[in-house]
A protein has these predicted regions:
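Pre-Walker A adenine-sensing motif
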Residues: 5-18, 234
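Conserved P-loop
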Residues: 19-91
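Short, glycine-rich nucleotide/cofactor-binding loops
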Residues: 26-35, 111-114, 238-256
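Loop/turn-to-beta-strand initiation segments
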Residues: 51, 97-100, 129-135
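Conserved ATPase-coupling elements of RecA-like P-loop NTPase cores
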Residues: 105-120, 144-147
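Substrate-engagement module of ASCE P-loop NTPases
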Residues: 118-138, 160-161
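Internal gly/pro-rich beta-alpha loop/helix module
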Residues: 135-198, 203
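Long, charged amphipathic helices and adjacent flexible linkers at domain junctions
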Residues: 197-245
Length: 256
């Protein structure tokens, strides 16, 4: 499914349910383009006449992502003073009127005193209010994959979302890049600032780690799609779960 078809499918879902529809972009690691893709979707929805607003977006200073924020309505963040510092959080109470809201950093832990402890709980409230949500999360923040990711990279990630959050999604989409493409983006300064690049290369961004994380992300999304098929298509239709393998030679003279 290409991007235009994906957005159209989401538009179709909007018309079918009173509860907001829920779309999650999954990434194997930071920098694959989840926020960029959400903002691209938002522009297409806006052009289609859908009332879409940004509830919370984290650009991480990435120029390409910041450029896409331009032209999109943004709900101002709530400012809270906590331990002597001003902290900005998503303003849940102000997200009342749009049809669709963009909410980044799904696994985020809210500052003390917020209505909910976790942002994914905010998202559940938004959905229950009849507002659709497009959000994003990396696989290391998914509870069911947390230990496997820790085995791969040797780092325990504290902020997590329960698997049931994914099970409630109407769409789960994997944002994929090859290891070479991702490392090229990192080294070009498109993911982290220069002083953080080497640390990233020594941890999550080792080539062998990326390959294993990519496999985990692909398997997770495939599992969610399979479960969605099983829960929505009647058994009497006799759906077959096919598996295909394509072998493509690197020799340009080989017939394709």
């Amino acid at each position: 499914m290409d991007r235009e078809q994906s957005v159209q499918h989401f538009l179709d879902l909007l018309k079918k349910s009173r509860r907001g529809n829920f779309k999650i972009y999954i990434g194997m690691i930071a920098g694959v383009g989840k926020s960029y893709r959400m903002l691209s979707d938002a522009h297409q929805l806006l052009e289609s006449g859908i009332d879409v607003k940004i509830g919370y977006i984290e650009t991480h200073g990435r120029v390409e992502t910041e450029a896409l924020v331009e032209g999109l309505p943004v709900i101002p963040r709530r400012k809270i003073f906590y331990k002597g510092k001003e902290i900005e959080e998503m303003d849940l109470q102000s997200i009342l009127s749009p049809e669709v809201v963009i909410v980044d950093e799904l696994a985020h832990t809210n500052v003390e005193g917020s209505k909910n402890e976790k942002r994914w709980q905010d998202v559940m409230d938004i959905l229950d209010a009849g507002i659709s949500v497009i959000t994003a999360v990396n696989i290391q923040h998914i509870e069911g994959l947390n230990e496997m990711v820790q085995d791969v990279v040797g780092i325990e990630v504290k902020e997590r979302i329960p698997d049931i959050v994914l099970e409630q999604a109407d769409e789960v989409v994997n944002i994929d890049l090859t290891a070479d493409e991702l490392l090229a983006r990192l080294k070009a300064g498109k993911i982290y600032k220069p002083d953080k690049i080497q640390t990233a290369l020594n941890n999550f961004f080792k080539a062998e780690h990326i390959l294993q994380l990519r496999e985990l992300a692909l398997k997770e999304v495939a599992l969610r799609v399979e479960k969605k098929v099983e829960s929505t298509i009647p058994e009497n239709l006799g759906v077959r779960h096919e598996r295909f393998m394509a072998c493509i030679s690197s020799n340009e003279k080989t017939p394709r």
